[in-house]
A protein has these predicted regions:
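Helix-loop-helix
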Residues: 1-25, 75, 175-180, 194-212, ...
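Juxtamembrane extramembrane loops of integral membrane proteins
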Residues: 8-94, 100-104, 150, 568-579
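Soluble non-transmembrane domains of integral membrane proteins
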Residues: 58-327
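Generic detector of short, locally flexible boundary/turn motifs and exposed helical patches
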Residues: 36-43, 48-52, 138-144, 156, ...
Length: 579
C-alpha cells in the first residue's frame, strides 16, 4: 500500500449583430491596407512579389469579438488568428474568468512555410481583410453557425483565406484554410499549421496543476507527451499521420484535430522559472502540424476542428479520437484495467447521479455507498478468512509441536487442517488485491473529474481542492501548512476500523502498528482533493457498519473446531448413506 501511495500521490447567413460591449481598435479600411502586386502576368518576379509580405507587417490591425453561450473569443485581422478565448461558466480559484488563450501576444494560430527564396512566411505578420460590413462584435444565436472569413490577397490570383465557424452550444471551432495560386512561392511539398499558446494556470495549487500540464500528440494509437517536470525545454517529433495535438492544464485543454492527412507533427515545451509556486513561473507549448502540398496543385484546402474548453469526458469522447487518453488515470502498467473501470463504470455512474442530485458532496456519498455494496462480498470474505486464521493459531502451534523436526509433515498437516476448516491462507489477502485496481482508479478519478471543481459541501468550499479547517503559520514536510477536515476524520475512522477488525496487534510495542497506517494516510491525504477524502471517510464508516452487523470478525477456537467436527460428521453420514 505504501508503494502504491508513493507512486500515485500527486505531490471547456451570420446572425444580426447587436451593440458592441467593449472597445476595439478602429477598423482599417481596405484603402489603408498595403497594395499588392496586380497580377502574376505583369512580369514581376517571385522575389518582387514577396515584398508584399514585408509591407504587410507594419499595417494596423482590427480586432473582433465573437460571443457564444459558452465563451467569448477575440480575433485579430493581423494573422487572422485567435488572440484570446475566455470561458463564461468557469472561474479561476480567485474568481476570474478562465482564459484558455491569454498569453499569446501575436495570436495562437498561424500558417508557415519556406519560400523558394529561402524566406520564412508567417501569416501572423500579414494583415487580412474582412467582408464589408463586418461589425466589431458578433453574437452567435442558440441554433446558429457564424462563419467569419479572413482574406489576404497578394494579387487577384494569389490569396490566402482563413475561415472560422462558431456555434453557440459547443466548444468546437471549425477552421478552413485555403491557399490559391501560391505554388511558385512555396518551396518543397509542405506547409505548417502552428498552435503557439500555452494554457494558463487556473488552480490555487500550482504545483499539482503543473504536474498535470503538458503537450500531447496522438498517432497510430500511441500517445506522445511533453511534460516539463524535469527539463526546461523538451521537444518531440512525429512523422506520418497524426490524429490530433493538444495542450492542457489540470481541467482544460486546447485540441487541434486535422480533417485531412498530415505528414507529421512537432510538440515543443518551454519552462520559465523553476518552482510552480513562484508567480513568474510559466509553461509555454508550441504545436506544429505538417501538411502536404503538392507543387503541381493550384490550390490547397484543409479543414480542422479546434476544441478549446473543459476536459469533460463525454465532450471529448464524442470525437471518437481517444482524446481522453491525455488524462492520467493511473500507472501505465495498470492502464488496461484502470481506464475501462473509470471510463465505463465510474464516470457513467457519477454523471448519472449528478443529473438528479443537486449537491456533488451528496453524489460522492451515494457513490461511496454503491461502491461499498459492490465490494461487500469481497471484503466480507476477507475479514471472515482472517478471523478463521486467528482462531486456528492454537491448532497450528500444536502441529508445529507435534512435528518439530519434520517441516514436510508440518506442511502436510497444516494443509489438511486448512482443507477441513475450509480456509485459504491467501483468503485474507486475495480479496484486497482484487480491490487494488478499483482503489487506484478512484485515487485518480476524483482529482480528474471537472464536475466537482469549485463545488462545495459542508465546510469544504471546493471538492477538487483540500478542505482546510486550520491554516498553520508554518509548513510541515510531507504534510503542508494546513489541516484538512475530511482527512482528519478519515484517519480517525480508519483507526476505529482497524481495532474493530481485530487485525491489528494490541500488546506491547506492536500496538503502534494499529496507528501507523492511519497516520501515514493522514499525512499523504492532507493535500489531495477533499472529494477523495470525503469518499474514503464515508467508505470507512460503511466498513465499520459492515464489521458491526454483517461480518464475523471474532471466531472462537472451540466454536470453529466444533464446526469442523460437524462437517466431518455430515460427510461421514453421506458416505454411510451411499453404502
Amino acid at each position: 500500500m505504501m508503494i502504491w501511495l508513493y507512486y500515485l500521490t500527486p505531490p471547456p447567413p451570420p446572425p444580426r449583430p447587436k451593440t458592441a460591449q467593449e472597445e476595439v481598435p478602429e477598423a482599417v479600411s481596405p484603402q489603408e491596407e498595403p497594395e499588392a502586386p496586380t497580377s502574376e502576368r505583369t512580369g514581376q518576379s517571385a522575389e518582387d512579389s514577396l515584398d508584399a509580405f514585408s509591407r504587410a507587417v507594419a499595417a494596423p490591425e482590427r480586432r473582433l469579438v465573437v460571443e457564444t453561450e459558452l465563451y467569448t473569443a477575440e480575433l485579430s485581422s493581423r494573422g487572422a488568428t485567435l488572440r484570446q478565448l475566455t470561458l463564461k461558466h468557469y472561474r479561476t480559484w480567485d474568481g476570474k474568468p478562465v482564459r484558455l488563450i491569454a498569453d499569446s501576444l501575436r495570436g495562437a494560430l498561424e500558417l508557415g512555410w519556406l519560400t523558394t527564396t529561402n524566406r520564412n512566411v508567417e501569416t501572423r505578420r500579414l494583415l487580412f481583410s474582412l467582408e464589408p460590413g463586418t461589425p466589431d462584435t458578433l453574437r452567435v444565436g442558440a441554433s446558429d453557425t457564424l462563419r467569419l472569413p479572413f482574406t489576404w490577397a497578394l494579387d487577384s490570383l494569389r490569396r490566402i483565406r482563413i475561415e472560422y465557424a462558431f456555434t453557440s452550444r459547443n466548444y468546437e471551432i471549425g477552421l478552413q484554410v485555403r491557399l490559391e495560386g501560391l505554388r511558385s512561392l512555396i518551396a518543397g511539398r509542405q506547409i505548417d499549421l502552428v498552435w503557439d499558446s500555452g494554457v494558463p494556470f487556473a488552480e490555487k495549487d500550482r504545483r499539482t496543476e503543473a504536474m498535470e500540464m503538458g503537450a500531447f500528440a496522438y498517432s497510430g494509437g500511441v500517445l506522445e507527451a511533453v511534460r516539463l517536470d524535469r527539463e526546461d525545454t523538451e521537444r518531440k517529433t512525429l512523422s506520418g499521420q497524426v490524429d490530433w495535438v493538444a495542450v492542457r492544464n489540470h481541467y482544460f485543454a486546447s485540441v487541434l484535430l486535422p480533417g485531412e492527412p498530415t505528414e507529421g507533427a512537432e510538440i515543443l515545451g518551454m519552462r520559465i522559472g523553476q518552482k510552480p509556486e513562484d508567480p513568474e513561473y510559466a509553461e509555454h507549448y508550441r504545436l506544429r502540424l505538417t501538411l502536404p502540398f503538392h507543387p503541381d496543385s493550384a490550390r490547397l484546402e484543409k479543414r480542422f476542428r479546434l476544441y478549446i474548453g473543459p476536459m469533460e469526458y463525454y465532450r471529448l469522447a464524442a470525437y471518437e479520437k481517444n482524446l481522453y487518453r491525455m488524462v492520467n488515470l493511473g500507472p501505465g502498467w495498470l492502464d488496461w484495467i484502470v481506464r475501462p473501470l473509470t471510463q465505463y463504470v465510474f464516470i457513467p455512474v457519477f454523471t448519472f447521479l449528478g443529473r438528479f442530485i443537486p449537491n456533488y458532496g451528496l453524489v460522492i456519498i451515494l457513490f461511496s455507498i454503491l461502491v461499498k455494496i459492490a465490494l461487500h462480498p469481497l471484503t466480507a470474505r476477507s475479514y471472515e478468512s482472517m478471523a478463521k486464521m486467528r482462531a486456528l493459531q492454537p491448532e497450528l502451534e500444536a502441529i508445529k509441536a507435534r512435528y518439530p523436526d519434520n517441516p514436510q509433515k508440518q506442511q502436510e498437516a497444516i494443509i489438511k487442517l486448512y482443507r477441513e476448516v475450509g480456509v485459504n491462507p491467501l483468503g485474507g489477502c486475495l480479496p484486497m488485491l482484487l480491490q487494488l485496481p478499483i482503489l487506484i482508479a478512484l485515487w485518480r478519478f476524483f482529482p480528474s473529474v471537472i464536475e466537482i471543481r469549485q463545488k462545495g459541501f459542508l465546510w469544504a468550499r471546493d471538492l477538487s481542492a483540500p478542505d482546510s479547517i486550520l491554516d498553520l503559520p508554518f509548513s510541515i514536510p510531507l504534510y503542508g501548512d494546513h489541516v484538512s477536515g475530511f482527512t482528519l476524520l478519515m484517519a480517525l475512522t480508519l483507526i476505529l476500523q482497524t481495532r474493530m477488525s481485530g487485525s491489528g496487534a494490541t500488546q506491547g510495542q506492536m500496538a503502534f502498528l494499529n496507528y501507523l497506517f492511519p497516520i501515514m494516510l493522514f499525512l499523504f491525504f492532507n493535500n489531495v482533493a477533499s472529494g477523495l477524502s470525503l469518499y474514503y471517510l464515508v467508505f470507512n464508516l460503511l466498513t465499520i457498519l459492515q464489521l458491526k452487523f454483517f461480518v464475523r470478525t471474532e471466531i472462537d477456537h472451540a466454536t470453529l473446531m466444533a464446526e469442523v467436527q460437524g462437517k466431518k460428521g455430515r460427510r461421514g453420514a453421506k458416505k454411510s448413506a451411499r453404502r
